[in-house]
């Protein structure tokens, strides 16, 4: 019988975790309101905003082929172009016609498998429940809550060694890596994972607190405990949301290998999109790994073709950044992977233990846990106090508020010029909303500042992305200019500060972005450059995530700075049109969720075009409604404030004049 774990139905022992949604103080910091110049009651909450089906976004970070590590970070209710954007209830499995059934090489009858594990069966229960209820049929797992304040005992590597929780070989390897102390999530999770062999684990911890080692250490200890049985067999499968995070986890495994020769016997292989499939299979056959790390799409491809060969003896499956996996739209893929692993397992369909690590635990993560937990007991380990901010307390956060969106660019460039020059070993990350905007800013900064500038986004091929990550990790100073592809899981040492121009694609991504600094117990800072119209976002951030930013500065652009930047643009008007339109499309898709008045914000972004060209009256030229239709603004009256719209000629010349931009396909 399939067991399930629900965070919503718990005993009185764990009633403290009933309100999983973090709520901040009802007293709102007045400084936001002072800058915005309005009363808070005038803004509607996120829940009051109905979804507008006409909201669309330019898909400028997707690719023609769907990848398991897509980097466009859109919500599932947004629309892209040419069929590339996630849609409601979309799964990457929709692109694979064979994924309703296992390949016959795995020993399954296709029709029987489809009836048993149909992707349309929301509960995935063995009894074939198709009710779609939140709690599937089946026996509920016993839930044990281990809260942050349940124990004040400090757990160290030495204490784990003395209690025989970890072996001498593993202790030596980790000690040689320079670990001074275990982080809270490591102290809470390592011993329960190792000693409670009949329990699944759900762990919640802030970003940048060492979740990777919290599951790698127990995995290695399990491999040591079952050394004879574990060699030359895949015993652990780790699922990561992006290629870069999967490769980073592989690097951490290699570090553990390098400190103890005995641990090298347990090989590791990564399976990610953008790499040669056949070469990966040959490498698995060559090294016979004990640990496989991958993104959902590539894992499914390999398991469908070679499941019986490689994945019959799995003991652990780990979901790292589970909330991020769900944001991208991988819920059905994760349930599908879980079903394949359980069915292929030679021990039993309930043998595999599940370790789920996440920075947030919303209803989506709860629903996923219902589908994939196998054991009769589930330990919920929480390292976050409900009353403390979700952002790392050692990050000094600052808002720089300008009058217009164009001010964001000037303020950021001035800041990087100043601190990049006077700060020794200045190492920073600049986050931007779209790929085109990222390319644009990287080009400008290469001319404006004397720092190594790295451009990083989803349209860069995987080989180059891996090289950029490795180079930036080793650099003592430099600037990484990137989209949200670098917001989660990426561990770059010694980041001085995190910079942001504008807003992230999802509210939690603000927390994950700034989490790239102040890692491993160090301090850091973040500076976000916004216009006054964007301030409501930070009201929601405080209400929903208890994050209050007290340092707020006003930016006043200097005319000579603006003129100097305009002279150094070296970009054609058509290219600038594309850049600004991509930003408009991005904001168009998320403004209502953030409580921002789009009638003020979108024209402000559009006027950046004229500002950068030193002609405030110049608007983006559009021929007809072709682009407006793609933006979902063909019937919006504010379009006339934003664009210079040339009406289509009469019926005898319907095509009419078009700029190069309007001839482009999206």
Swiss-Prot record:
Domain Helicase C-terminal: 408-560
Source species taxonomy: Eukaryota, Fungi, Dikarya, Ascomycota, Saccharomycotina
Stored InterPro entries: DEAD/DEAH_box_helicase_dom, Helicase_ATP-bd, Helicase_C-like, P-loop_NTPase, RNA-helicase_DEAD-box_CS
Short motif (DEAD box): ranges: 320-323
Transit peptide: 1-22
Organism: Candida glabrata (strain ATCC 2001 / BCRC 20586 / JCM 3761 / NBRC 0622 / NRRL Y-65 / CBS 138) (Yeast)
MF terms in GO: ATP binding; ATP hydrolysis activity; G-quadruplex DNA binding; G-quadruplex RNA binding; RNA helicase activity; RNA strand annealing activity
This protein's record includes keyword Hydrolase: yes
Protein name: ATP-dependent RNA helicase MSS116, mitochondrial
Biased composition (Basic and acidic residues): 38-60
Gene giving rise to this polypeptide: MSS116
């Amino acid at each position: 019988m399939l067991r399930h774990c629900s965070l919503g139905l718990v005993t009185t022992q764990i009633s403290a975790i009933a309100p999983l949604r973090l709520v901040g103080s009802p007293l709102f910091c007045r400084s936001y309101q002072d800058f915005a110049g309005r009363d808070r009651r005038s803004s509607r909450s996120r829940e009051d905003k109905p979804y507008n089906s006409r909201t669309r976004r330019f898909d400028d970070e997707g690719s023609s082929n769907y990848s398991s590590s897509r980097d466009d970070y859109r919500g599932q209710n947004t629309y892209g172009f040419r069929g590339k954007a996630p849609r409601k209830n979309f799964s990457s499995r929709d692109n694979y016609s064979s994924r309703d059934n296992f390949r016959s090489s795995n020993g399954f009858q296709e029709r029987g498998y489809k009836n048993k594990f149909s992707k349309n069966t929301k509960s995935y229960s063995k009894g074939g429940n198709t009710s779609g209820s939140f709690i599937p049929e089946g026996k509920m797992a016993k839930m044990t809550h281990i809260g942050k304040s349940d124990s004040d005992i400090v757990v160290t590597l030495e204490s784990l060694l003395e209690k025989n929780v970890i072996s001498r070989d593993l202790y030596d390897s980790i000690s040689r890596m320079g670990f001074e102390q275990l982080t809270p999530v490591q102290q809470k999770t390592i011993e329960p994972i190792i000693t409670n062999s009949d329990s699944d684990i759900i762990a919640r911890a802030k970003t940048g607190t060492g979740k990777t080692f919290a599951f790698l250490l127990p995995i290695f200890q399990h491999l040591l405990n079952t050394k004879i049985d574990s060699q030359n067999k895949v015993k652990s499968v780790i699922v990561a949301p992006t290629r870069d995070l999967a490769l980073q986890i592989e690097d951490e495994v290699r570090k553990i290998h390098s400190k103890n020769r005995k641990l090298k016997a347990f090989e590791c292989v990564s399976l990610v999109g953008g790499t040669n499939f056949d070469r990966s299979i040959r490498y698995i056959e060559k090294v016979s790994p004990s640990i496989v790390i991958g993104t959902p799409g590539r894992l499914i491809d390999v398991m469908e073709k070679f499941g019986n060969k490689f994945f019959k003896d799995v003991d652990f499956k780990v979901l790292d950044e589970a909330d991020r996996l769900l944001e991208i739209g991988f819920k059905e893929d994760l349930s599908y992977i879980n079903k394949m692993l359980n069915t292929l397992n030679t021990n039993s369909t309930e043998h595999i233990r599940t370790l789920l690590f996440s920075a947030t635990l919303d209803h989506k993560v709860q629903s996923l846990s219902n589908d994939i937990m196998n054991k009769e007991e589930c330990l919920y380990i929480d390292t976050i106090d409900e009353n403390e901010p979700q952002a790392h307390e050692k990050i000094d956060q600052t808002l720089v508020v300008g009058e217009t969106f164009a001010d964001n660019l000037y303020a950021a460039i001035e800041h990087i010029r100043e601190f990049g020059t006077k700060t020794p070993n200045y190492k920073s990350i600049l986050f931007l909303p779209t790929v085109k905007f990222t390319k644009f800013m990287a080009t400008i900064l290469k001319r404006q500042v004397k720092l190594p500038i790295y451009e990083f986004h989803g349209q860069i091929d995987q080989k180059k992305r891996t090289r950029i990550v490795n180079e930036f990790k080793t650099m003592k100073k430099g600037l990484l200019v990137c989209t949200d592809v670098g917001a989660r899981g990426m561990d770059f040492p010694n980041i001085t500060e995190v910079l942001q121009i504008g807003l992230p694609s999802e509210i939690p991504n603000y927390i994950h972005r700034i989490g790239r600094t102040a890692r491993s117990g160090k301090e850091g800072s973040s500076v976000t450059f916004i216009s006054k119209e964007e301030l409501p976002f930070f009201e929601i951030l405080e209400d929903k995530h208890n994050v209050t930013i007290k340092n707020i500065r006003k930016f006043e652009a200097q005319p000579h700075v603006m003129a100097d930047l305009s002279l150094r643009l070296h970009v054609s008007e058509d290219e600038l049109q594309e850049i600004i339109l991509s930003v408009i499309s991005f904001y168009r898709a998320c403004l209502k969720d953030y409580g921002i008045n789009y009638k003020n914000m979108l024209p402000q972004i559009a006027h950046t075009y004229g500002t950068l060209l030193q002609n405030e009256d110049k608007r983006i030229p559009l021929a007809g409604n072709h682009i407006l239709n793609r933006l979902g603004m063909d019937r919006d009256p504010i379009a006339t404030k934003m664009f210079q719209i040339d009406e289509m000629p009469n019926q005898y010349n319907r095509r009419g004049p078009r700029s190069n931009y309007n001839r482009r396909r999206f």
